[in-house]
């Protein structure tokens, strides 16, 4: 059984363009009896920004945590458990002010745990989440891929690589606010990429 963790982050929910792209991909694989899909909408989760108190809860031995620390550590523990259980991570990512949504960053902050999802060595950090892949569906109002304005792609690649996920595919739909013709063309190109990714 292949487990897919689909992470959505659009403020527009299922109507968001990144959500539509990711759902098109999931639609093509969900009828396979060997695939199980778990969905999470980080925009609706409304995770708070990471605090020193929460990080301290992680670093406190479980046997020594107080009630508040147990509750704080559980937030990250549940997220990490879902990521560890997945064979593929699907990310639906809109571009907000040239970056990823803050809700997604808050989610990522609960994934990066020293000794759990990565470790430090004499030669640098090593990711611990091996044998996983990620597929990113990036929707943008303008055209930014390959330019300095695209901070998403390098950040997402670096973060995923950092925790051990090096098999990463990107599907872009750009220029969605630059007229109907451009938007239709962008979606058509993205759908072709989706078909390629779901073949066989």
From Swiss-Prot:
Name the UniProt record assigns to this protein: FMN-dependent NADH:quinone oxidoreductase
Organism: Alteromonas mediterranea (strain DSM 17117 / CIP 110805 / LMG 28347 / Deep ecotype)
Assembly: Homodimer.
Note accompanying the cofactor annotation: Binds 1 FMN per subunit.
Residues the record lists as binding FMN: 10, 95-98
Cofactor(s) this protein cannot do without: FMN
Sorted UniProt keywords: Flavoprotein, FMN, NAD, Oxidoreductase
Family as reported in the entry's similarity comment: Belongs to the azoreductase type 1 family.
EC category name: oxidoreductase
Record bears the keyword Transmembrane helix: no
Gene expressing this chain: azoR
EC numbers for this chain: 1.6.5.-, 1.7.1.17
Transmembrane regions: none
Coiled-coil regions listed in the entry: none
């Amino acid at each position: 059984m292949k487990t897919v963790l689909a992470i959505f982050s659009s403020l527009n929910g299922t109507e968001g363009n990144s959500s539509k792209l990711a759902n098109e991909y999931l639609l093509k694989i969900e009828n396979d009896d060997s695939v199980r899909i778990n969905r999470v909408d980080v925009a609706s989760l409304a995770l708070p920004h990471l605090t020193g108190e929460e990080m301290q809860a992680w670093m406190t031995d479980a046997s020594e945590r107080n009630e508040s620390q147990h509750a704080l550590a559980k937030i990250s523990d549940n997220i990490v458990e879902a990521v560890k259980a997945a064979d593929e991570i699907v990310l639906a990512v809109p571009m907000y002010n040239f970056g990823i949504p803050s809700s997604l960053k808050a989610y990522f902050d609960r994934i990066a745990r020293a000794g759990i999802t990565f470790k430090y060595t004499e030669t640098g950090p090593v990711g611990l989440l091996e044998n996983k892949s990620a597929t990113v569906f990036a929707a943008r109002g303008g055209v930014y891929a390959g330019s300095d304005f695209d901070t998403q792609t390098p950040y997402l690649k670096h973060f995923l690589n950092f925790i051990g996920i090096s098999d990463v595919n990107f599907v872009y739909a750009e220029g969605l606010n630059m007229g109907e013709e451009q938007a239709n063309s962008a979606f058509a190109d993205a759908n072709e990429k989706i078909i390629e990714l779901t073949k066989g």
